[in-house]
Regions:
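Alpha-helical transmembrane segments and their helix-helix packing motifs
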Residues: 1-176
Length: 176
């Protein structure tokens, strides 16, 4: 149940020692969250950004609102943009907002931060390099992709890089 899950999460957050085990737990949580966000965006966006005329505007905006709600971002979006719901703003928010825990940029940065804390100070791991490059792309070149209509191919690229990071993480830390 939801209550049982929240009790477990609370126990972990308030009692677990902040050692390597906790860092790996947070790394896995962050990696799963950013991966899930990208998969949902990649699945939903083709229908939302189609070139077909928007005949039923209430339905059109309801779909964008549902996307935000499904990613637990509607309230955060409204704090930034108010009631205005523009697709370009939603995309920029979900992909590139540095303060929103469910945005792709925030998620990639969180994964990178956890990897950096796990890695030794003198040795940057292969997974950290992969995710670091992805985080930099999300920070510095992402907005142009929306304007150029390359968002779906960029999401495919993000999924590929997250997969590479996962494989490298497994190889480096778990020997598989």
């Amino acid at each position: 149940t939801h209550r049982g899950l929240m009790s477990t999460v609370g126990a972990i957050e308030h009692t677990l020692t902040r050692d390597a085990g906790w860092l790996f737990l947070k790394l896995g949580e962050s990696l799963e969250r950013v991966f899930r966000t990208v998969v949902i965006l990649r699945t939903k966006l083709p229908a939302l950004v189609s070139d077909e005329p928007k005949v039923d505007l209430p339905l059109f905006y309801s779909q964008w609102r549902s996307l935000l709600r499904g990613l637990s971002c509607l309230e955060n979006y409204r704090k930034v943009f108010g009631a205005r719901l523009e697709p370009i703003d939603v995309l920029q928010f979900l992909l590139f907002d540095a303060q929103t825990p469910r945005s792709v940029r925030y998620g990639a940065s969180a994964v990178k931060e956890h990897l950096d804390r796990i890695s030794s100070a003198s040795d940057v791991s292969q997974p950290a390099r992969i995710v670091g490059k992805l985080a930099a792309e999300l920070s510095y070149q992402g907005h142009d992709l929306i304007r150029d209509g390359q968002i779906l191919s960029f999401l495919d690229h993000v999924l590929t890089e997250l997969g590479r990071a996962h494989e490298a993480l497994s190889a480096v830390y778990f020997g598989s």
